[in-house]
Amino acid sequence: MKAENTTLLLVEDDPNDVVLVQRALRRAGLALQVRSAGSVAQARAYLTGELPYADRAANPIPSMILLDLKMPGGSGIDLLTWMRARADTRRIPVIILSSSKEQGDVDRAYDAGCNSYLVKPVAFDALQEMFVAFGRYWLEFNTAPELQRISRSTVQPS
């Protein structure tokens, strides 16, 4: 997986954290196409190609997802469970990015099918350094699965 061909869906409800993550990714040298969704409902709409995300040229299928756990209107675990139950989304790598270090949250995330669990550092420099390592692993060393094309014809009922 190469960064310039990689679309990352950032599912995060805090607009300040969205900006912070995008800036840290850029400063880490990762030229990813970042799309964001501020809720579980928006992420589901993005993944299934519902309006306003129907244009796949503008809203490509993500190669990976950075997912917050605690959001209003549904948790990251809810989205992850939904994704893993669907043929068209189950192979998309999901990396939890949460401020929670609670072992119960970590265990629930892995039980639901996350591929990695990262704890958001408080300091920006530490976040940037985390994304340098993230990029090396996910974009240089990891061999990604083939993802099904998600189109309106492959969308399964929720």
PLM features: what roles do these ranges have?
Residues 42, 122-134, 142-148:
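C-terminal output helix
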Residues 39, 60-63, 75-78:
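Acidic catalytic/metal-coordinating carboxylates
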Residues 67-69, 98:
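Active-site residues of response regulator receiver
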